[in-house]
Amino acid sequence: MSQGKVVQIIGAVVDIEFPQDAVPRVYDALRVTEGDLSGLTLEVQQQLGGGVVRGIALGTTDGLKRGLTVENTGNPIMVPVGTKTLGRIMDVLGNPIDEAGPIGEEERMSIHREAPSYEDQSSSVELLETGIKVIDLVCPFAKGGKVGLFGGAGVGKTVNMMELIRNIAIEHSGFSVFAGVGERTREGNDFYHEMNDSNVLDKVSLVYGQMNEPPGNRLRVALTGLTMAEKFRDEGRDVLFFVDNIYRYTLAGTEVSALLGRMPSAVGYQPTLAEEMGVLQERITSTKTGSITSIQAVYVPADDLTDPSPATTFAHLDATVVLSRDIASLGIYPAVDPLDSTSRQLDPLVIGQEHYDVARGVQTVLQRYKELKDIIAILGMDELSEEDKQVVSRARKIQRFLSQPFFVAEVFTGAPGKYVSLKDTISGFKGILDGEYDHLPEQAFYMVGSIEEALEKAKKA
């Protein structure tokens, strides 16, 4: 392959001069072949003219010197795919980082691929039961849909994601791919051990580009994970693709954009924000052979949902699960806001009339309680009408019944995790709305699985 020389280094951005007749294409992978950083991979981002290309380094550039030889591999970044990647931790280039020997893959695929054509895409609507009451009730997931977990720092995005992986691996025995994009290394480590302890590690491929890595790694690691998920889908499987955190993907794009000298747009984000997000999201889709159901954690800067990054993400999603700091402060976990969370599947034609009526009934009661809170704060409960007192009582029971002990949080809570089927979830909330459990104390509904457990808890109290 053609060889070039390093001519300029600015942080993670490196300019390399090639012969005029052998200039690498955009997105080609280049490899440094000499010096201390021999083996460092660069990805071409721009062709500057005069045989010079500008690349972004997928690794540290400390110790890189001008004049070093760089060779063009002639291909984009190629990563291992297939069942050999299950149970392994890899970096953005598909190299193992779990000290368990080579991957031994039978095939590698380019991380840059076209999205499936319109004819190939499937349009079937099938619900994916998660076993988490609040999600199954008010913002049900579709098989092959895209879900966003929105929340500020520390409200439980990663824990919710771990619970979803565990439930789907155990209850539905499906494969998952997890892309850790710009998150804490400690979380990546915890995640690995949690999956190991839950005996689901052999059903998950893990790809990490953590906070301490250069922006090129964080920008591309989501595509690495997606390529692995696409391979499973093309083999006819239903696969789950988890991204934690899609905001860091945007942020890495902002860093790369600034390093490449592009003009920033609103709030300092890259001018290509919508296009970069579209390139990733359009590939996450279901075809007639298999499905990719994607669950993406979305960090919301300063809890502001109108920030360009979360706002751009919203446009691509089928369901949004909004985690609320106010609900977390009440000690109700998962801290999902049932009034803010939505799903395109919440339609009687998709989920059936009974489910729809119960979900809307729950939201109506909670909304009325929210409106009455101001009156209660000023005048107290005694000033309410009997009807409103009943609404408040049921709303508080519903609020507590929306909480649930998680399997992955057993270590912290000391309570065994619960998986609640959709049927039990609907019948439980229907009973509360119909007044069947008005005689029970509200504390009986806190941190239980099905309604039967609430009845047991009330008897013991």
Swiss-Prot record:
Main location: membrane
Subunit structure and binding partners: F-type ATPases have 2 components, CF(1) - the catalytic core - and CF(0) - the membrane proton channel. CF(1) has five subunits: alpha(3), beta(3), gamma(1), delta(1), epsilon(1). CF(0) has three main subunits: a(1), b(2) and c(9-12). The alpha and beta chains form an alternating ring which encloses part of the gamma chain. CF(1) is attached to CF(0) by a central stalk formed by the gamma and epsilon chains, while a peripheral stalk is formed by the delta and b chains.
Entry's Gene Ontology cellular component terms: plasma membrane; proton-transporting ATP synthase complex
SUPFAM superfamilies: C-terminal domain of alpha and beta subunits of F1 ATP synthase, N-terminal domain of alpha and beta subunits of F1 ATP synthase, P-loop containing nucleoside triphosphate hydrolases
Gene3D superfamilies: 2.40.10.170, Bovine Mitochondrial F1-atpase, Atp Synthase Beta Chain, Chain D, domain 3, P-loop containing nucleotide triphosphate hydrolases
Keyword flag ATP-binding: yes
Alphabetized UniProt keyword annotations: ATP synthesis, ATP-binding, Cell inner membrane, Cell membrane, CF(1), Hydrogen ion transport, Ion transport, Membrane, Nucleotide-binding, Translocase, Transport
Matches recorded under Pfam families: ATP-synt_ab, ATP-synt_ab_N, ATP-synt_VA_C
Family: Belongs to the ATPase alpha/beta chains family.
InterPro entries: AAA+_ATPase, ATP-synt_VA_C, ATP_synth_F1_bsu, ATPase_a/bsu_AS, ATPase_alpha/beta_chains, ATPase_F1/V1/A1_a/bsu_N, ATPase_F1/V1/A1_a/bsu_N_sf, ATPase_F1/V1/A1_a/bsu_nucl-bd
Subcellular location: Cell inner membrane
Organism: Alteromonas mediterranea (strain DSM 17117 / CIP 110805 / LMG 28347 / Deep ecotype)
EC number annotated for this UniProt entry: 7.1.2.2
Cross-referenced SMART domains: AAA (SM00382)
Gene: atpD
MF term (GO), any: ATP binding
UniProt topology in membrane: Peripheral membrane protein
Superkingdom as given in the UniProt entry: Bacteria
Reactions accelerated catalytically: ATP + H2O + 4 H(+)(in) = ADP + phosphate + 5 H(+)(out)
Annotated function: Produces ATP from ADP in the presence of a proton gradient across the membrane. The catalytic sites are hosted primarily by the beta subunits.
EC primary class: translocase
Name the UniProt record assigns to this protein: ATP synthase subunit beta
Binding-site list for ATP: G151, G152, A153, G154, V155, G156, K157, T158
